[in-house]
């Protein structure tokens, strides 16, 4: 914690004497509270991100970004360094036979969205080439929309045989290109963005708005401020189990009424622009959450799917 505070002190460009005085008079908890307040401020993130490229998103844990653009029939790999993305390679690909976003099983469409690579599957039929990289479709947002289907892979081509110039929904590359792609990434630290047409890059202003909003949302959650907390949710909010905003808000009001003391820590935050077929400016936020209260203890992944509308961040789905 001390290392975190010292690092943030210099990053924030605050007067060290002010924080030292605060520490001397009120203790380390007051210093931490002041720093947490700064995380809700636009000024901090403007300074922190000023030299960083966020075109493909903001990543604290992911090291590789795969960008698939269906209309262009191309998939590109980028490697993240400290402040930028290094272009690694680009390959032609084939995708679902039918255009558009995937909604139903068997529609022969490739989904638009953001997905993890969950597994390298080697026990595949020779029709799929040497192996397949399994994606996380359907994700939480897909499930909230009742999207159907599964088994969306990045795979190869049949050995010594021809095939159609399209798939049932997967992304497919020539086998040497698939093998070269896999050699150049760590699928456990990769994110896949699938866009229908040309990918819409994120802006620094969007990422800053999301980061400040996440920390304001966390603060409202921590302090059981139900009105402010719920203000971050869209009226169209829906969980994967189809729980809508009305029932969700009633559940949260009951929990917040207990006014329990709690600590909430976020780390390894990743923010990805979310290509979609709804005309929304969407992002997927993934982070590690450490939640501790007298009645609930949770350490694990937290995912938010949000849209920016009228310069506000609204949560559409959550896990």
Regions found by a protein language model. Name each.
Residues 42-151, 161:
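Gly/Pro-biased beta-strand-loop elements
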Residues 4-12:
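Sec-dependent N-terminal signal peptides
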Residues 92-98, 154-158, 289-292, 316-319:
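Short, solvent-exposed aromatic-acidic interface loops
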Residues 230-273:
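Short solvent-exposed beta->alpha transition segments
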Residues 273-319:
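Exposed beta-sheet edge and beta->alpha loop/turn motif
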Residues 107-112, 119-215:
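Exported/periplasmic cell-wall-interacting domains
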Residues 206-225, 232:
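Short, aromatic-enriched amphipathic alpha-helices that serve as compact interaction elements
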Residues 17-58:
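Extracellular/luminal recognition modules and glycoprotein regions
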